[in-house]
Design a protein with these regions (language model features):
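Membrane-proximal lumenal/periplasmic loop motifs of glycosylation machinery
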Residues: 37-48, 60-83, 95-96, 257-260
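Short acidic/glycine- and proline-prone juxtamembrane loop motifs at membrane-interface regions
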Residues: 44, 140-148, 306
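Hydrophobic, aromatic-rich transmembrane alpha-helices
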Residues: 110-114, 197, 262-294, 324
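Specific aromatic-rich, kink-prone transmembrane helix
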Residues: 112, 150-174, 316-323
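Membrane-embedded, lumen/periplasm-facing catalytic core of multi-pass transferases
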Residues: 117, 348-478
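Membrane-interface alpha helices of multi-pass inner-membrane proteins
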Residues: 129, 156-157, 161, 168-182, ...
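Hydrophobic/aromatic-rich transmembrane helices and adjacent perimembrane loops
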Residues: 186, 290, 302-332
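Membrane-lumen/periplasm interface segments of specific transmembrane helices
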Residues: 206-250, 256-271, 295-297, 352-367
């Protein structure tokens, strides 16, 4: 009996040892990623609008659809998940819960991505995790609440279930993912080549039939789910994407999103992975990788303005990049000089950075605010120059800020990215709480929103305090709690960025006798305008992001 127990203990110890050896790098990656998750604060203004609807339902009762949201038809399920969790964990705000949901989903997504890619490439876990470091969206997506992450987590685990032969569970997850975010279906055609991995190329028609069954089942689940939640993604979401595609208002930002998704390192390594798979005649794996990538690139060619839009192709990009890295490592064997050169380049990119200052003379007056509070995070300057207007600095730490439509990304120094985001979120959250500390001294006041982000960024703190939203229309809404009322006005005028005179002409008529008119700008651009009004004596600044119009 003792010998049997000893044998079992020995086998358990061997299993645990193998798990630790295989997955220590993945565990370290998840812990490192968690630094940027905190504080549990949203820095992206679109998600702030969705959160406002969650808070309104938490305070005033659940409705279908929510009384306030952001592109609800595209992402209906996430609102009710957050509100449901708030009913259970009432001591947490909807904003904190949405951050936690995104973080947990990102952790599951990373684990699923590594599991999926390891199954198809047979590469060690540490190689896959190393390649993830140079695909920043794999961890950046965890650091601000967004619906793409739970949708992606469901999708990647559905693909894992396909490889495991658990077809029913895979289809269930594929039906759940679009309810979190509908655009995940763009990459669903990858199911067919994955089924060929499972059943073999001799059973093509069986794979085609299973793909058709999955498609019908997914359409049925999404139709029923959206109908139950009062969402219509076909009519509203497809029309939205079509208008964005035709209008091209986001097309100029696509290149920044792609640069931050792939990074300059992966752009070099990924083609190498394609060549390696081609030479190995791993054509099915190559098709599996390239098919969803081509589909998503085509669909988002003018609208993929943030890294999260490209998140769904992460496992396929990772397989190509990790294959390229493995080929580089193999080539460096026995070549000491090459090994040191590659290691030096990797360390330089991952740990070192160049930062530049963008002065008004270079950025023009419309972008004079660029580079102030976005140069956050740890940065140790090793040397700098003052001879050029850019005032370049080279050092160790988070690199130059790269603007995307939704996310705060950096050009290099990715090892420090979680610390960069932690510092940025802490500072931004502190600014709106400073504004609230002053506004709480006023019984009643008005707020004017000069930009999209200003409409709800600060006001979410009031909703967290139990304020009720009433009278919402195209011009604003009213927040009430007891005897306190806050009237929120939307400014529809297209005020040129940096034009303080135009801003004041718009704000002045909104000021009512006996009621302070506050502006709490979420964006650097509007804060810059308000600072100019302070200098002109037409506004008073009570906190870093709290201004009162005179």
């Amino acid at each position: 009996m003792n010998d049997m127990c000893s044998a079992r203990s020995g086998r358990l110890g061997m299993v645990l040892t193998d798990i630790i050896k295989s997955y220590w790098s993945l565990a370290l990656f998840l812990v490192w990623m968690a630094v940027g998750v905190f504080p549990l604060s949203c820095y992206e203004n679109d998600s702030m609008h969705l959160l406002a609807g969650c808070s309104v339902m938490a305070n005033q009762g659940v409705t279908v659809p929510p009384p306030y949201s952001y592109f609800y038809d595209m992402q209906p399920l996430v609102s009710y998940v957050v509100v449901g969790l708030n009913a259970v964990f009432a001591w947490l705000t909807c904003e904190q819960l949405y951050c936690l949901v995104t973080w947990f989903a990102a952790c599951f997504a990373v684990v699923g991505t590594v599991r999926f890619c390891r199954r198809l490439t047979l590469l060690p876990v540490h190689v896959l995790v190393f390649a993830l470091l140079f695909l920043p969206e794999s961890y950046a997506c965890a650091m601000y609440p967004n619906s793409a992450v739970p949708a992606y987590a469901c999708f990647v685990w559905a693909m894992c279930m396909v490889l495991d032969g658990r077809f029913v569970l895979a289809v269930a997850l594929m039906g759940l993912a679009p309810l979190f975010r509908i655009d995940v279906v763009i990459v669903y055609p990858v199911l067919l080549p994955l089924l060929l991995f499972v059943y073999g190329r001799k059973k093509v028609w069986r794979c085609v039939a299973l793909s058709a069954v999955a498609a019908v089942a997914v359409v049925a689940m999404v139709t029923v789910g959206c109908a139950a939640m009062g969402a219509d993604p076909v009519r509203h979401t497809l029309g939205m994407y079509s208008s964005f595609d035709v209008g091209g208002q986001y097309s100029g930002q696509v290149k920044y999103a792609l640069f931050t998704f792939y990074t300059i390192v992966s752009v070099v390594v990924l083609p190498l992975g394609v060549v390696v798979l081609w030479r190995r005649r791993s054509l099915l794996l190559l098709v599996t990788c390239l098919l969803p990538m081509l589909l998503l690139h085509y669909m988002f060619r003018r609208t993929g303005c943030a890294g999260k839009h490209w998140l769904y192709i992460l496992p396929f990009v990772l397989m190509l990049c990790s294959t390229g890295w493995a080929a580089i490592a193999h080539w460096c064997n026995g070549r000491r000089g090459a090994r040191y050169a590659v290691a030096a380049l990797v360390v330089l990119y991952a740990f070192c950075s160049v930062r530049i200052t963008i002065p008004p003379a270079v950025a023009k007056v419309s972008k004079a605010w660029v580079g102030n509070e976005r140069q956050e995070g740890p940065f140790l300057t090793l040397f700098s120059e003052d001879l050029t207007p850019m005032k370049c600095r080279f050092g160790i730490g988070a690199g130059q800020f790269i603007p995307t439509a939704d996310e705060m990304m950096i050009a290099s120094g990715n090892v420090f990215y979680p610390f960069y985001i932690h510092a940025y979120k802490s500072n931004k959250d502190a600014m709106r709480r400073e504004a609230k500390a002053y506004a709480d001294t006023l019984p009643c006041y008005d707020i004017a929103a000069l930009a999209w982000g200003d409409r709800i960024w600060y006001q979410n703190l009031l909703l967290d305090d139990g304020y009720a939203m009433t009278g919402k229309n195209d011009d604003g809404y009213v927040l009430r709690k007891g005897g306190s009322t806050v009237d929120c006005y939307y400014v529809h005028d297209d005020i040129p960025k940096g034009d303080a005179a135009a801003a004041y002409r718009t704000l002045k008529p909104l000021k009512r006798p006996g009621r302070p008119l506050l502006v709490v700008p979420e964006t650097d651009a509007r804060a810059y305008v308000m600072d100019k009004l302070v200098a002109l004596g037409k506004a008073v600044r009570h906190a870093r992001r709290c201004y009162e119009v005179r």
